[in-house]
Amino acid sequence: MSRVAKKPISVPKGVEVSVRSDMLTVKGVKGVLTFPKSDNVNVVVDGDILTLSANDPSHVSLAGTVRAILSNMIKGVSIGFERKLELVGVGYRASMQGENLNLSLGFSHPLVFVPPEGITLLTPSQTEVVVQGIDKQRVGEVAAKIRSFRPPEPYKGKGLKYAAEAIMRKEAKKA
């Protein structure tokens, strides 16, 4: 069996997990997340411990995937997720206008990004953007979408980058 699927998940206080025949629902302080349940994976709730098992050996990897998703759902509704982006470059600025994010990235026009439902955007400074939410996948998707407006270039490192991202720098051509 998958080593990931063998490990039980502990459910913290304030988080409620319900298992139906076709849906897994996780309710917590920050919100509610649902995930479609596969018939090939058994989910057993025993007090504050969740255990998963596969119906047959060919679905062991699926059980590991479902376990990882469930673990992220539990963490999301209790703590939440965030990704930080940094703007590097002269004149590159970020600001909030209501719920929308305004980005000045050296184009002839400012970019306006409308966040999807369930995602919160913050700008602690003009060169930082913080993406927050309860769904890890959506937080990552939104952060990647914002980064795609001006990815960092390898010569000067200008652009939008993740806070912990190391940019591989290239040396300029010597004449």
Curated annotation (Swiss-Prot):
<dbReference type="GO" id="GO:0002181">
    <property type="term" value="P:cytoplasmic translation"/>
</dbReference>
<keyword id="KW-0699">rRNA-binding</keyword>
<dbReference type="InterPro" id="IPR020040">
    <property type="entry name" value="Ribosomal_uL6_a/b-dom"/>
</dbReference>
<keyword id="KW-0694">RNA-binding</keyword>
<dbReference type="InterPro" id="IPR000702">
    <property type="entry name" value="Ribosomal_uL6-like"/>
</dbReference>
<dbReference type="InterPro" id="IPR036789">
    <property type="entry name" value="Ribosomal_uL6-like_a/b-dom_sf"/>
</dbReference>
<dbReference type="GO" id="GO:0022625">
    <property type="term" value="C:cytosolic large ribosomal subunit"/>
</dbReference>
<dbReference type="GO" id="GO:0003735">
    <property type="term" value="F:structural constituent of ribosome"/>
</dbReference>
<dbReference type="GO" id="GO:0019843">
    <property type="term" value="F:rRNA binding"/>
</dbReference>
<keyword id="KW-0687">Ribonucleoprotein</keyword>
<keyword id="KW-0689">Ribosomal protein</keyword>
<dbReference type="InterPro" id="IPR019906">
    <property type="entry name" value="Ribosomal_uL6_bac-type"/>
</dbReference>
<comment type="subunit">
    <text>Part of the 50S ribosomal subunit.</text>
</comment>
<comment type="function">
    <text>This protein binds to the 23S rRNA, and is important in its secondary structure. It is located near the subunit interface in the base of the L7/L12 stalk, and near the tRNA binding site of the peptidyltransferase center.</text>
</comment>
<comment type="similarity">
    <text>Belongs to the universal ribosomal protein uL6 family.</text>
</comment>
<dbReference type="Pfam" id="PF00347">
    <property type="entry name" value="Ribosomal_L6"/>
</dbReference>
<protein>
    <recommendedName>
        <fullName>Large ribosomal subunit protein uL6</fullName>
    </recommendedName>
</protein>
<dbReference type="InterPro" id="IPR002358">
    <property type="entry name" value="Ribosomal_uL6_CS"/>
</dbReference>
